[in-house]
């Protein structure tokens, strides 16, 4: 064997086991540890036995979050409707335009009361 044939054989002998196991030389050791921790966490979650109480608590918390979102969305929608129908910043708006002036009106009942002298 010549040296040119021996070099690829030596590379294959020393580097081959890393590729067979799925590990490469450029992959750092801490990534392998992190992936093993993640695999362990996933199997722990998969092996967890969920009781009916756990499931009902989870459902209740999800429903509560959805209700809060619904209330906020409804409030925002009603506020946007009110803002579109009524302009509070209108300069021409006068508080007293909507009310008629009743101060000068005299009712028939009031006239009768003026003529009557109360005993007290």
UniProtKB/Swiss-Prot annotation:
This is U-scoloptoxin(25)-Er1a. Residues 1-22 form the signal peptide. Belongs to the scoloptoxin-25 family. The lineage of its organism: Eukaryota, Metazoa, Ecdysozoa, Arthropoda, Myriapoda. It is found in: Secreted. GO terms for molecular function: toxin activity. Keywords: Secreted, Signal, Toxin. One of its GO terms (cellular component) is extracellular region. Its main location: secreted. Expressed by the venom gland.
């Amino acid at each position: 064997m010549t040296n040119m044939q021996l070099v690829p054989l030596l590379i294959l002998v020393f580097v081959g086991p890393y590729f067979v196991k799925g590990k490469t030389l450029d992959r750092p050791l801490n990534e392998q540890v992190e992936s093993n921790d993640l695999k362990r966490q996933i199997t722990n979650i998969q092996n967890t036995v969920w009781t009916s109480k756990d499931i009902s608590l989870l459902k209740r918390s999800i429903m509560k979050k959805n209700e809060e979102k619904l209330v906020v969305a409804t409030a925002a929608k009603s506020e946007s409707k009110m803002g579109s129908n009524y302009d509070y910043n209108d300069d021409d708006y006068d508080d007293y335009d909507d009310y008629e002036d009743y101060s000068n009106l005299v009712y028939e009942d009031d006239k009768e009361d003026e003529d009557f002298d109360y005993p007290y």
